Amino acid sequence: RDVERSRGLGDVYKRQIGDKAFYKRYLMLAIPMIIQNAITNLVSFLDNIMVGQLGTEQMSGVAIVNQLIFVYNLAVFGAVSAASIFGAQYFGKGNHKGHMYSFRFKLYAALLVTAIAMTLFITNGTALISLYLTDTAENGATEVALAYGKEYLKIVMIGLIPFAVTQAYATNIKETGQTFVPMVASFAAVGSNAVLDFLLIFGIGPIPK
């Protein structure tokens, strides 16, 4: 009777909570995705730290632009995540044509969001950055921060289209259960970003500061 009771509890546990194989598979998929998202957010963190060594105005300008880019990142993430729901279902059913269509939608949606964001940044970049600035001390620091922010925004905009395309491809790969590849790509991106930031911000050897 005790054996039957334990078996019954085990069956309830598996139905309601899941078995070890499920959690192992889940962790193998989820952990690389968690690490990738953390690494992606680490890029702006590194930028703020390194630029902060140059001065308060530079730090303020970069931090403000990173806030704007963060909103853009959320918009792209929402666009590709919505289509990923269908993409995962298509792939699970073996409908590769439907999976291809979902990828196309993600790519077009991400590029559309990017086009809208770039249009706003080009036409209203100064106004958007100015929303974060108030010259309470009246010492001209806000104008300096605004100038640095506008300069930094022009540089960041260069990478928006590659970022959008990368997000579309990365989510498509994740739908197939391959979450390790995007994580490795994120490590490579953060590593190259950190090295280039250090070289271009502080100047090493022939590279000007």
Q: In which residue ranges do the predicted regions lie?
A:
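Single conserved hydrophobic/aromatic residue that forms the stacking wall/gate
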Residues: 1-13
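Residue-level recognition of transmembrane alpha-helices
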Residues: 30, 63-66, 110, 153-156, ...
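Helix-loop interface residues and adjacent transmembrane-helix termini in multi-pass membrane transporters
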Residues: 42-45, 53-56, 90-93, 175-176, ...
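Small-residue-rich hydrophobic transmembrane alpha-helices
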Residues: 59-122, 163-182
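Short membrane-interface helical motifs at transmembrane helix boundaries
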Residues: 116-154, 204
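Membrane-interface helix-loop junctions in multi-pass transport and translocation proteins
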Residues: 190-209
